[in-house]
Amino acid sequence: MAERTHACGKVTVEAVGQTVQLKGWVQKRRDLGGLIFIDLRDRTGIVQVVFNPETSKEALEVAETIRSEYVLHVEGTVVERGEGAINDNMATGRIEVQATKVSVLNAAKTTPIIIADDTDASEDVRLKYRYLDLRRPVMFNTFKMRHDVTKTIRNFLDTEEFLEVETPILTKSTPEGARDYLVPSRVHDGEFYALPQSPQLFKQLLMVGGFERYYQVARCFRDEDLRADRQPEFTQIDIEASFLTQDEILDMMERMMTKVMKDAKGVEVSAPFPRMKYADAMARYGSDKPDTRFEMELTDLSEFAAGCGFKVFTSAVESGGQVKAINAKGAASKYSRKDIDALTEFVKVYGAKGLAWLKVEEDGLKGPIAKFFGEEDASVLMNTLEATAGDLLLFVADKKSVVADSLGALRLRLGKELELIDESKFNFLWVTDWPLLEYDEDADRYFAAHHPFTMPFREDVELLETAPEKARAQAYDLVLNGYELGGGSLRIYERDVQEKMFKALGFSQEEAQEQFGFLLEAFEYGTPPHGGIALGLDRLVMLLAGRTNLRDTIAFPKTASASCLLTEAPSPVAEAQLEELNLKLNVKEEK
């Protein structure tokens, strides 16, 4: 078998007159009565091959047996196409290959999905036949971008003198965060490893070990409820450094991301990225990961609401809640009563009891609650919301968390429906100064907003014992177009501070020692100040490639129910395997 001389998508007019050896898949076959045309595809693109009896009867006879997705080896001569046959939509559209020889390297059954960017297959079928789905050019291009992103990051971190170090996959189960995936030990009866949710503790121990600058393209595992942008196993760019301030870490990440955007996407983004405190993000956007590509910020009307004539507003403020609104500029005529009812049902998903609304017309406010506002109140309301004729005003009155969640989600929905979002923009944003802890009423305890190893502001350390809810974290999230790309922080590196953190989280001394004794002891041997960040590679590629589903950026992903339709994992195992592990199943019957 002769060696391939050209990739299909790389045959250009410069090769006219040359004999080429091509190998690839049949994208399409057209029989034009005496002539057969085949579009031959490989990962670089498509080239048209012509089978002509005047060139080779033998090749034509073979071509008559060929069908879509057959794998071929074609030998032929490159010629220019006639003027009327030029296809400028293809990189190879000015030439074609006149086949002199062809051999079938492998035949193919009729595929269950169309091998094209615009396939009509359902996602389940695509996942079951993932090896066919991956043949689609859009999928290859996504993974080429993933490779380019990873390569650029590695090269950048190498120039910054970071070492790539692998940390364990079999590790210790810890109680914080999502559920662990557990792996039973055959050697240690009744004991289990856990797959890492992140390399957090190990990268900190590498700082204790004096490595100073570490990174890893790390596989992580979390047994959690899945969404469109979550997977049970995922990849993060994990970075940690000693002796750097928060500003130095953020500056380095900005330089890295601007290089990624330029090298992998061909887009120039400016640095430094804007910074916004967590409290401001929640107040203005109702989200800790705001999409800043469009306006429509939330406006706090609580002071106005406390003295207005609408009881729903006043009672919300009196009970410690708040009233906020968004002004959908020029949207009054675009939303009927039925449309607004749909928006009301939408905010109820986020805990809101309802959605109040007003339309601004030339002669004043119109809508079901307009009667509750006199002329003076209406004027104040319009001035506060900068409302003019044609605007749609939408209000939620409730607990602060409900107001933020519901209006934040409504803002994003309206941004899409009203086409306010410039999809060509890439808006990076740092969200800083997070709360250190969050209180869970159901569990009646505090949880770490990021993780238990986040350093509080120095002046807030004592608050861990007196007012934990007021303690601020030296933490930062990187947001891109409303998606959290990753999060990081400066880390606790002193034993006494870490013990105070564990105590605030409800750990007894014994529990802290049992779970994290190795870390606490490490902090007694000269641990340097350190910090870092972890960036979600899958999500970054999803955004840069213009995909809407994280599964499109992972070669062999799981479904929303954490199963693999291709291999049918998870699956039962043999009784002998369980006996070897001294395990017995106690499967609950479905009711």
Curated annotation (Swiss-Prot):
Pfam families: GAD, tRNA-synt_2, tRNA_anti-codon. Residues 200-203 are annotated as: Aspartate. It catalyses: tRNA(Asx) + L-aspartate + ATP = L-aspartyl-tRNA(Asx) + AMP + diphosphate. ATP binds at residues 222-224, 231, 484, 536-539. The record marks 84 as: Important for tRNA non-discrimination. Keywords: Aminoacyl-tRNA synthetase, ATP-binding, Cytoplasm, Ligase, Nucleotide-binding, Protein biosynthesis. GO terms for biological process: aspartyl-tRNA aminoacylation. GO terms for molecular function: aspartate-tRNA ligase activity; aspartate-tRNA(Asn) ligase activity; ATP binding; catalytic activity, acting on a protein; nucleic acid binding; transferase activity. Aspartyl-tRNA synthetase with relaxed tRNA specificity since it is able to aspartylate not only its cognate tRNA(Asp) but also tRNA(Asn). Reaction proceeds in two steps: L-aspartate is first activated by ATP to form Asp-AMP and then transferred to the acceptor end of tRNA(Asp/Asn). PANTHER family: ASPARTATE--TRNA LIGASE, MITOCHONDRIAL (PTHR22594:SF5), ASPARTYL/LYSYL-TRNA SYNTHETASE (PTHR22594). This is Aspartate--tRNA(Asp/Asn) ligase. It comes from Bacillus anthracis.
